[in-house]
């Protein structure tokens, strides 16, 4: 859960350039379209970046095909996606900015303790965006909203790593 909480990064709207209500709506609706695919999201990230998989002790060094259909994998994927869903749901409302900042700050602190690098957060971002592009209605407006949300998230997380 810890690493994919990174996904949560994607949704902050609580920094210098918070998401507008329209941008938050685009992020939320596109996320809603895929958030039930927890296992597929995590598997896509691991397939694209095995170094991320190796940050998870219970999955490190194992063949993705052999772990993808296990209960442990599904449970972990659900934890990650649930965290991301919480952050995404809070985005776009100025009164939630402090809550989002707290969640994302803790994410950065927790990942620093695990030795996760800014580069690995970047890999996660790339894999997540690729998954979204392949599985939701994706246009320039959706891409811009996700990029802004992810930029905002990284502005909080990266300095804490």
Swiss-Prot record:
Homodimer. This is Globin CTT-VIIB-8. It comes from Chironomus thummi piger. Pfam families: Globin. Residues 1-16 form the signal peptide. GO terms for molecular function: heme binding; metal ion binding; oxygen binding; oxygen carrier activity. The lineage of its organism: Eukaryota, Metazoa, Ecdysozoa, Arthropoda, Hexapoda. Transmembrane segments: none annotated. The keyword Signal applies.
């Amino acid at each position: 859960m810890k690493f994919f909480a990174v996904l949560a990064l994607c949704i902050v709207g609580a920094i210098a350039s918070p998401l507008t209500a329209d941008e938050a709506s685009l992020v939320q609706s596109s996320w809603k379209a895929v958030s039930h695919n927890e296992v597929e999201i995590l598997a896509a990230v691991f397939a694209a970046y095995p170094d991320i998989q190796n940050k998870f002790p219970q999955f490190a060094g194992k063949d993705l095909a052999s772990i993808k259909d296990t209960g442990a994998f599904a449970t972990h994927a659900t934890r990650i996606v649930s965290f991301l869903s919480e952050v995404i749901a809070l985005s776009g409302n100025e009164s939630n900015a402090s809550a989002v900042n707290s969640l994302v700050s803790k994410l950065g602190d927790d990942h620093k303790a695990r030795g996760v690098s800014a580069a690995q957060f970047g890999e996660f971002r790339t894999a997540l965006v690729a998954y979204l592009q392949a599985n939701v209605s994706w246009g320039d407006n959706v891409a811009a909203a996700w990029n802004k949300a992810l930029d905002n998230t990284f502005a909080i997380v990266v300095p804490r790593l």
